[in-house]
Amino acid sequence: MANGIYSSYLPLRRIVRKIEQILREEMDKIDGQEVQFPVVMPASLWDESGRYDSIGDELLRFTDRNNAKMVLGMTHEEAAVHLVREYAQSYTKYPFMIYQIQTKFRDEARPRAGLIRVREFTMKDAYSFHTSQEDLEQYYEKCHAAYERIFERVGVPEVVSVKSDSGMMGGNISHEFMLLTPVGEDSIVLCDSCDYRANMEAAENISDIARDAESAALEKVYTPNVHTIEDVCNFFGDETKNSCKAVVYQQNVDDKYVVLFIRGDLEVNETKLVNFLGERSEERR
């Protein structure tokens, strides 16, 4: 119908209904309660969470006929919290989990690969509420196991669960299930000697390079027609891993500059930078 927007019909609808039934069965096994949130939400809920301003153009914003600011739901954390405020005012109602299967809209900058990256899509999202961190962590493991069963039941057993970046959703712990394919666009790290698995955006490592040599005296050197760190290292006849480069970013909020010093053979992980700064920045070279 449009870029990133598709209609579905038989036999796709039959397949989708079967997958949705599997999702419901597995969510019900871990005591999930199915709900239905509104697609359109008042902007005030998103103002309260701070995401009305922090999320970019992916969030579709509009004004209704009464000049009230509204958003078209791309996720429903705010709506879930609003529901819990009204429903679960007593600690005796905790813990509990609510989930829904709903059409959502995210204004992707580059919709591509058919149904893989679209703007309008169906998503099963779930939200759980607990009285302690320990209870939350235990339930997180139940959810993780439920998703493993889901992938097994739908016939996609070759997925890999990896540590991931929580992105706009926030949180300290996040995993995503990655389907290994040569046409994929994400990279993951798998350790051969342990169970560590992570998306490159969230992966952590310890440098295996140690520099025992003493630093030479500081000296100003003329480097004509040398523009990159590779050019500089070639000019001095050394490897880029033995150098340090500065990368400058401009913060969008107040136009302040952030200078990052990183080993010459590495690149800045901009996802980690955004998480550290709490906002998006633009690179200035």
Where in this protein do the model-derived segments appear?
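Acidic, His- and aromatic-enriched active-site or binding-groove loops in soluble protein domains
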Residues: 51-73, 179-195
